């Protein structure tokens, strides 16, 4: 098992990575939550049949009372209505401020459960048990929790750090191949922005079997990079913006597909390639880098370009949290392994994307 400690002002928590951790969830939670009597587990309709009873048995074996709440799988559950249902279910279960909420699922479950934990009873302890690769390397680490509004994704949320993150690579075995590779888009992103050697390591292992054989190392490397960024910039005002490489344009592709045609990972993959090509045009990115990135992503079965209208680009740029007034910070690559924010007028960005 590998352990990373995220140290933030006034508090810290561990990210634990290891095969078989799901069956040891009870003892791991008891170690960090000695005074809790109840764990309120939030999961979804895909994950519950696979892993809920295993986690429940482990938690009960450690002396916790367990209440489980299952939401429909999919982005549609990350909404205010589901959040309100969750609050009421927590109150029905008798949740107290000494108890805890555990998210057992992917990014939707983690965001929804985390926002509920941040707001119920003015905040209760929260544990992440991510079951998708995307959630393991991205949304479960860093404390961002949110729900979507009709105006866009993640517009109502909070920063609420977990007490513990448990990552069991075994859960990735049950992911459909497209969902597994969707997570690999975020994995590749870490190599692009911070570690060229890690990018080369991934590019040399394009098959799922090769990647799973190295999964503890992959998860550890990604989480170590994200930890270093989050420790420097918990509230997403500076260094943490680098994690959004590929996301500004990726959100445009998600919007163009009405959030159903393209997965988040596929959109980010295409967004990274578009950002690399943009960087070349702006004189920031080396000319050979886009092809190198496209080859690695194509080998993983991910798209390197997605059709998008000027209107969708404009809508995504308008909602981007890195924008201020008439300008926006776009994350570009100076070289493989080094990302930088590039401030430019929104109008210029939209013109470059035509």
What kind of region is each of these model predictions?
Residues 200-311:
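Active-site segments that bind and position negatively charged phosphate/pyrophosphate groups
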Residues 1-100:
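ATP/NTP phosphate-donor binding region
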Residues 108-115, 136-137, 252:
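Short glycine/serine/threonine-rich phosphate/pyrophosphate-binding segments
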Residues 87-104, 113-128:
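Non-catalytic interfacial helical region
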Residues 67-69, 102, 127-129, 164-167, ...:
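Hydrophobic/aromatic beta-strand patches that form the interior of the parallel beta-sheet core
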Residues 16, 115-207:
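A glycine/threonine-rich phosphate-anchoring loop and its flanking beta-alpha core
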Residues 2-4, 12, 185-187, 284-354:
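C-terminal charged capping/lid subdomain of soluble metabolic enzymes
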